[in-house]
A protein has these predicted regions:
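Metallo-beta-lactamase
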Residues: 2-15, 21-22, 27-30, 43-46, 94-139, 146-148, 172-173, 177-180, ...
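Residue-level detector of beta-strand structural context in well-folded domains
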Residues: 12, 34-36, 116-118, 141
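Short, hydrophobic/aromatic-rich segments at coil-to-beta transitions
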Residues: 18-25, 73, 122-128
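Active-site metal-binding motif and surrounding structural segment of the metallo-beta-lactamase
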Residues: 50-101
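Structured loop/turn residues at beta-strand edges in well-structured enzyme cores
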Residues: 69, 123, 188
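Generic beta-sheet signal
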Residues: 77, 97-100, 116, 153-154, ...
């Protein structure tokens, strides 16, 4: 199983809820890169998108559920998640939105860019800093809509297998296991959390987040051991 898929993508829907849905373009890849379409009154916002055949029809379907046929914009929430944001934005004639404080991203996007802080356009989603550090290099923004209880965490949390130790169903990223973003994420008690690797948690997400943060350090070496074993065994 490759870390990242290549070639023709095979879009698989995840995370359908009243207000959006997600997709994984390469379901068989280890990283399980997840993207999301958030339907708002301002149109559909695409979060950290990976392109795939059938994506535009998928976006239209998500928009139809909310009574909109417009793509409002594309947003990059992690400095490493430029993915296919520029190509998709150009195709739909919209800007790529990049947090104002995030460095080294806007100049690498071959598309019009809008820098933003606070609310993402008129989406109802408020942006906030999850992590902005040089060691490890990490610039991550979260999104939260208090009206729908939807939280987007693009990297610090995930459900892909390499995020999970023991019986965890939502885990902290391996690189952050010893320094989890507990102070930031524990402020939220969302109904659902959408993540950038794997399917999200669509109910009682606040409890799942608290459990993940609480077990982060305790389960760190179990996760590292599992990862090392998988690497050795292939």
């Amino acid at each position: 199983m490759p870390m990242k898929g290549r070639g023709p993508a095979d879009l698989r829907e995840i995370d359908r809820f009243d207000g959006g849905a997600g997709w994984i373009a390469y379901p068989d890849e280890t990283m399980e890169r997840a993207s999301h379409a958030l339907a708002t009154d301002a149109g559909v916002w695409l979060v950290d998108p990976v392109d795939a055949d059938g994506l535009d029809a998928f976006i239209a379907d998500v928009g139809a559920d909310a009574g909109t046929d417009e793509v409002a914009g594309v947003v990059v929430c992690l400095d490493r998640h430029k993915r296919d944001a520029a190509a998709i934005a150009r195709r739909h004639g919209v800007d790529v939105y990049v947090p104002r404080w995030m460095n080294g991203v806007a100049g690498e996007l071959d598309a019009p860019v809008t820098r933003f802080s606070g609310e993402l356009g008129d989406s109802g989603f408020e942006s906030f800093v999850i992590r902005d550090s040089s060691l490890p290099p990490w610039q991550e923004a979260g999104l939260y809509d208090p009206d729908t209880g939807t939280l987007v965490v693009p990297e610090s949390l995930g459900t892909a297998a390499y995020f999970l130790a023991d019986d965890e169903t939502l885990g902290v990223h391996p690189m952050l296991r010893l320094t989890p973003p507990a102070e930031v994420l524990s402020r939220y008690d969302p109904e659902r959390v959408l993540v950038g690797h794997g399917a999200g948690v669509l109910s009682a997400a606040g409890e799942a987040i608290n459990d993940a943060l609480a077990s982060s350090k305790r389960n760190a070496f179990a996760l590292y051991g599992k990862t090392a074993k998988q690497f050795i065994m292939g």
